[in-house]
Swiss-Prot record:
Organism superkingdom: Bacteria
Gene of this entry: csmA
GO cellular component: chlorosome envelope
Name listed for the protein in its UniProt record: Bacteriochlorophyll e-binding protein
Biological process according to GO: photosynthesis
Family: Belongs to the BChl C/E-binding protein family.
Keyword Electron transport assigned: yes
InterPro entries: Bchl_c-bd (IPR001470), Bchl_C-bd_sf (IPR038387)
C-alpha cells in the first residue's frame, strides 16, 4: 500500500491512538487531532474537488 491515501492516514492515526494509550502523552493527542483535521480536509477535497 503506497502512495498515501485514506487507508494510510487511518493506519497512521490508529498508531498514534495506540501511542496515546500506552504513553499517555497529551501532546500526541494534539498532534492526532491536527493530523485528523488535515486528513478530513484532504478527503473532502478528493470527494468534492476545489469548490
Amino acid at each position: 500500500m503506497n502512495g498515501g491515501g485514506v487507508f494510510t492516514d487511518i493506519l497512521a492515526a490508529s498508531g498514534r491512538i495506540f501511542e496515546v494509550m500506552v504513553e499517555g502523552h497529551w501532546a500526541t493527542v494534539g498532534y492526532l487531532f491536527d493530523s485528523l483535521g488535515k486528513g478530513v480536509s484532504r478527503i473532502n477535497q478528493n470527494a468534492y474537488g476545489n469548490m
